[in-house]
């Protein structure tokens, strides 16, 4: 839910263990995978153009940071089960902002300048790595610098002879209260997949269920001297009071089931439907060594946000049917035809067809 392929990639410098590395001395029972990265957002022009003619906030020249660590327990040579778990986090920070709003409960609201240059020094890079510091419009209610968010992951795999299965879960969080167990983890992504023995009909089945409707509840209040109790709620996934939305060039950087700001009609760089429930189904097969196919279907309902709820939930139904042909006569060549459609009220209804040709390998020269 935190990072995916929905948005344009961010240029970044990345230090990574891309594959699991076995920890010496564990007899292949423990392995780790990790990365750390820093990058630079490249959507300055898009943000200015999208908000042009409005008083909506936008930013430019902000930085990106991500990090992750995963531990895998299991030795498939000795036992068919492996358990993988880990933490993934990311942050948008620094840059410059225009039309930024102050906190409505900040006593210095009258003197707040909506044009702000955020901190871009070494300390900000450290605050992104170890969440700390505060934002320019936090006022007296100091929080964490930048748009910090993350996900906990857990996956159990069964490695059978000629077949396999997996179940997995992901918990997304926007703050400390959901990073740990201050409130129950009601919002989750659950999934399962089965890889079948070799046959000409069906090779893989996938099911996933996503829920983001709780968000720690509908009430939020920072403690004050007169009312010292903190109430952590209204997490409003993918939203941030400085950077607007967890997006790059208009597209959500996590799951596209929380609609991207690009679809907003009023020029707001913000998620307008962060409370959703969705079911996803997928099948894949290889009728022959040259032909493959896949079918994906997703149904979702969206309730808007706690601050701007929908009276009736909007619905979306999405279908993709795709077939590929890779002839043996030309190794590396693949021809793909796809049909997709969007139905329901969440997005405009649409249908489309795509034909693609790809080649992987060296082109021989005479």
Segments predicted by a language model, with ranges:
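Membrane-embedded beta-strand positions of outer-membrane beta-barrel proteins
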Residues: 34-36, 83-87, 165-169, 205-207, ...
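Transmembrane beta-strands of outer-membrane beta-barrel pores
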Residues: 19, 38-44, 87-93, 160, ...
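Short loop/turn motifs that connect adjacent beta-strands in outer-membrane beta-barrel proteins
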Residues: 20-34, 72-84, 158-164, 196-202, ...
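C-terminal structural cap/anchor segments
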Residues: 216-305
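Internal, well-ordered domain-core segments that constitute the primary functional module
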Residues: 1-103
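Outer-membrane beta-barrel "beta-signal"
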Residues: 12, 349-366
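Long, internal scaffold/assembly segments composed of regular secondary structure
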Residues: 80-85, 92-225
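Solvent-exposed loop/turn segments connecting transmembrane beta-strands
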Residues: 146-147, 173-182, 272-276, 289, ...
């Amino acid at each position: 839910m935190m990072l995916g392929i929905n948005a344009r990639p961010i240029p970044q410098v990345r230090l990574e263990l891309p594959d699991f590395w076995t920890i010496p001395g564990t007899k292949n029972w423990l392995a780790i995978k990790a990365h750390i990265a820093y990058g630079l957002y490249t959507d300055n022009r898009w943000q200015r153009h999208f908000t042009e003619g409005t008083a909506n906030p936008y930013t430019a020249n902000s930085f990106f940071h991500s990090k992750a660590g995963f531990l895998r327990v299991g030795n498939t040579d000795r036992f068919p089960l492996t358990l993988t778990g880990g933490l993934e986090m990311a942050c948008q920070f620094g840059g410059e902002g225009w039309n930024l709003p102050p906190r409505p409960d900040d006593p210095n609201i009258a003197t707040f300048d909506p044009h702000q240059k955020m901190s871009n020094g070494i300390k900000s890079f450290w605050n992104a790595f170890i969440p700390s510091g505060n934002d320019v419009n936090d006022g007296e209610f100091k929080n964490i610098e930048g748009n910090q968010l993350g996900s906990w992951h857990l996956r159990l795999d069964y490695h059978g002879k000629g077949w396999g299965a997996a179940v997995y879960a992901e918990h997304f969080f926007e703050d400390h209260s959901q990073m740990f167990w201050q409130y129950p983890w009601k919002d989750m992504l659950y999934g399962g997949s089965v890889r079948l023995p070799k046959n000409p009909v069906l090779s893989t089945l996938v099911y996933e269920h996503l829920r983001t409707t709780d968000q720690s509840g509908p009430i939020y209040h920072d403690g004050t001297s007169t009312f010292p109790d903190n109430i952590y709620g209204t997490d409003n996934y993918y939203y941030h009071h400085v950077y607007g939305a967890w997006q790059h060039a208009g597209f959500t950087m996590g799951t596209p089931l929380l609609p991207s700001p690009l679809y907003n009609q009023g020029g707001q760089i913000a998620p307008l439907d962060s409370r959703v429930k969705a079911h996803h189904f997928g099948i894949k097969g290889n009728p022959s060594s040259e032909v493959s196919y896949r079918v994906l279907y997703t149904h979702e309902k969206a309730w808007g946000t706690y601050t701007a709820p929908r009276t009736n939930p909007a619905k979306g139904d999405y279908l993709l049917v795709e077939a590929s042909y890779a002839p043996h006569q030309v190794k590396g060549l693949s021809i793909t035809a796809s049909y997709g459609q969007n139905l329901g009220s969440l997005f405009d209804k649409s249908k489309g067809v795509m034909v693609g040709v790809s080649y992987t390998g060296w082109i021989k020269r005479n």
